[in-house]
């Protein structure tokens, strides 16, 4: 068997990566008559980027369109430049870079905003990094990519199935496969055997620390205004669901509860914005249980390099204030940030962490849950849960991935109890349901180290979250140019 080229002098592929590169080359050279490509679905942290660059440098074609989330564009550009691959970047409605570029880098949202430029040619290869971004076939993002033509097509995603069979069908549709509606599960299972390559991170168990330790911080209200308001909000949500209100209305009520759980003032500010400042007067004067619990974690350890995941921007500000008060140097990754600002924050946090300065990175979970290498942060705190288990898995592996040398601890702040019909606990129940469907489709898609929390007293007493919430979800768009 002939040797494969490495991206640059001094680089060497790990054994599983060489297998992956050869599999990708074989798929492009022979295919199956329908698709010269496939889905590289290795666990997060196994090096899908470098395997893809291995394909690019060993199987040369004319022009490759590489689509990625904004947070990953600079990471791709650096890796490709280091490998001697000439790139062009789409910015300000045109391609910027060498005319003889081999790889054209663009974000998902810029594809659908500039469809004429993206579809005026048949690309020699199209690569979707974090390809699960097109899982919802109804979105502009998915519809636009379905119109982009390519002789070879690749999906890179550690979580190609997040909500169910429709996710996988959309990816197969993009690759060119037709899946029948009758017997769809069996058809998808059969295709997954050939079109999808998946290896678990346990392959690297001998060169990585032990799996992350998950610590669940279960918090209970002590009564008072916070307790009473929470119950009122949960009651409204349950009433709306029982009455079969429109999903958009239910989603809004659900988000209001999430805001209140994060910090009551976030909820009050949101309601005042909606009603022109007339809904509440004055700031919240009561307790903020979850923020108090976060402060307690920092009281116990105000030194460990820490990664905190949040949902709301104001929530991130409260977390930042608490961390700063404990002596942390704080950095952000959130929707709307430019690539240069994001890159600077990550590099500075790495530099300071190496110097022994306490650093804390706050990530908005849908903006910083995929692709980033943040191994220097060894304590992960989920300030709030997310209803999509794959988002949680992606987020956790920003820290626990190949190259991590230290033990990683993950904290989950779970507010409430069964008696309070806790929202966060119900999310974890929904996680179990979604994961079981994913494993049914393809057993190898099981992520090795996600937490399986028991939910005591859940039997029918908790809220049942609507299954169509994911249809409402939107990742942050690119910064406005």
Predicted stretch roles:
Residues 112-116, 163-165, 316-320, 360-378, ...:
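SF2 helicase motor core recognition
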Residues 9, 36-37, 43, 51-60, ...:
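Conserved Helicase C-terminal RecA-like lobe
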Residues 105-110, 116-120, 140-150, 155, ...:
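Inter-lobe coupling linker of SF2 helicases/translocases
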Residues 72-93, 175-178:
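Conserved helix-turn-beta segment of the N-terminal RecA-like "Helicase ATP-binding" lobe
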Residues 44, 151-164:
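Conserved helicase ATPase motor motifs in RecA-like P-loop NTPase domains
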Residues 62-82, 311-314:
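Conserved Walker A/P-loop ATP-binding site and its immediately adjacent core
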Residues 1-39:
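Conserved pre-motif I regulatory segment
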Residues 387-396, 400-478:
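A conserved SF2-helicase RecA2
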């Amino acid at each position: 068997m002939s040797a494969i080229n490495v991206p640059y002098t001094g680089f060497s592929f790990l054994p599983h990566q060489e297998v992956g590169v050869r599999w990708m080359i074989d798929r492009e050279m022979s295919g199956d008559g329908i698709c010269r490509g496939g889905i590289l679905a290795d666990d997060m942290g196994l090096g899908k980027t470098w395997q893809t660059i291995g394909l690019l440098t060993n199987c040369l074609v004319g022009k490759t369109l590489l689509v990625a989330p904004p947070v990953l564009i600079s990471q791709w550009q650096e890796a490709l430049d280091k490998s001697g691959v000439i790139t062009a970047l789409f910015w300000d409605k045109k391609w910027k870079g060498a005319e003889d570029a081999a790889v054209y880098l663009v974000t998902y949202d810029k594809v659908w905003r500039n469809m004429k430029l993206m579809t005026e040619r048949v690309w020699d290869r199209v690569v979707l990094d974090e390809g699960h971004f097109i899982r919802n076939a109804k979105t502009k993002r998915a519809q636009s990519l379905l119109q982009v033509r390519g002789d070879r097509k690749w999906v890179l995603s550690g979580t190609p199935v997040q909500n169910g069979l429709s996710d996988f069908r959309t990816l197969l549709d993009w690759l060119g496969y037709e899946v029948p509606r009758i017997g769809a599960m069996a058809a998808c299972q059969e295709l997954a055997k050939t079109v999808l390559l998946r290896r678990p991170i346990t392959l690297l168990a001998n060169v990585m620390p032990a799996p992350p330790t998950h610590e669940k911080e279960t918090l209970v209200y002590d009564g008072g205004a916070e307790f009473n308001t929470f119950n009122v909000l949960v009651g409204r949500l349950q009433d709306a669901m029982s009455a079969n209100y429109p999903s958009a209305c239910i989603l809004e009520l659900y988000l209001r509860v999430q805001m209140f759980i994060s910090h009551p003032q976030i909820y009050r500010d949101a309601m005042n914005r909606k009603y022109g400042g007339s809904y509440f007067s004055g700031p919240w004067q009561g307790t903020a249980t979850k923020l108090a619990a976060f402060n307690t974690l920092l009281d116990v350890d105000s030194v460990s390099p820490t990664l905190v995941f949040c949902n709301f921007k104001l929530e991130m500000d409260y977390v930042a204030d608490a961390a700063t008060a404990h002596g942390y140097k704080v950095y952000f990754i959130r929707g709307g940030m430019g690539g240069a600002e994001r890159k600077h924050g990550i590099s500075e946090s790495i530099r300071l962490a190496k110097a022994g300065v306490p650093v804390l990175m706050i990530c908005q979970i849908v903006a910083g849950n995929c692709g980033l290498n943040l191994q220097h942060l060894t304590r992960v705190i989920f300030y709030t849960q997310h209803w999509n288990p794959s988002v949680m898995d992606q987020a956790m592996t920003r820290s626990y991935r190949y190259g991590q040398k230290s033990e990683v601890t993950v904290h989950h702040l779970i507010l409430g109890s069964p008696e309070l019909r806790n929202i966060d606990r119900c999310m974890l129940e929904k996680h179990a349901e979604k994961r079981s469907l994913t494993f049914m489709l393809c057993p190898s898609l099981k992520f090795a180290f996600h937490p399986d929390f028991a939910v005591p007293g859940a039997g029918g007493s908790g809220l049942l979250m609507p299954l169509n919430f994911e249809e409402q979800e939107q990742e942050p768009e690119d910064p406005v140019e």
